[in-house]
């Protein structure tokens, strides 16, 4: 059994990406499409592309694939980036998870069938394999697959493996055991709309030994740990082509930072620079970030 740098558990899908000329259109109007692609996407799919492009060996698992997703994922993730998808289940009765995204000047709007996917009586995602976690250095964990995601957190805790996660509540097992939890502005507004941000941040840090990061798009990043004062950092400024995948690639940068034993400040710097680099180019699977560009952005 080979040893991988990274094990990722979460959502990998086929995305139809339409980059618009200008901003998102008003209803009942016309908008020109500048570029269009069908490429790997999803929180874990995008994360895997970035980590592979940074020189990491990656194995991923999570949702089932089907006839409409397998070809593009095999072409890019497996053959182009060398990502191990050998454990992912192919379900010929299921098309696979897909979405369609319209990308405006500073927006990206996603259309999909995730409500139907997660609301279905049939769970179309794998149970995690303990041996996959045992044979990696660091784990990236999406919290969306219910008991199975929590099982990954339990395995990591039992095996002493550090993991980075995203967008889970402060009273969950996944948050409790995490090395890093990254909370997006979208998640915070959707789940804690009335909460004072600093009080909420403190609640998060009190419920884990790990690093907590709050992101707010182009506004200041908040980060810190239990019994520490809140630290802040301004995101890096770049000429934005597309904000699609910014959160997924921030997570990838944090995973890389944990793998390389970076300090908290360096993890946040590297994650923010990785996300900024991705925002400056499009699409991710054709133009992934590289260490030279990321480090140049940090050092400048």
Question: Language-model segments: which ranges?
Answer:
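Structural motif
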Residues: 5-7, 137-138, 180, 211
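Gly/Ala-rich phosphate-binding loop of Rossmann-like dinucleotide-binding domains
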Residues: 52, 157, 259
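Conserved N-terminal subdomain of the carbohydrate kinase-like
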Residues: 27-34, 53-137, 295-300
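Conserved phosphate/ATP/ADP-binding segment of small-molecule kinases
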Residues: 153-232
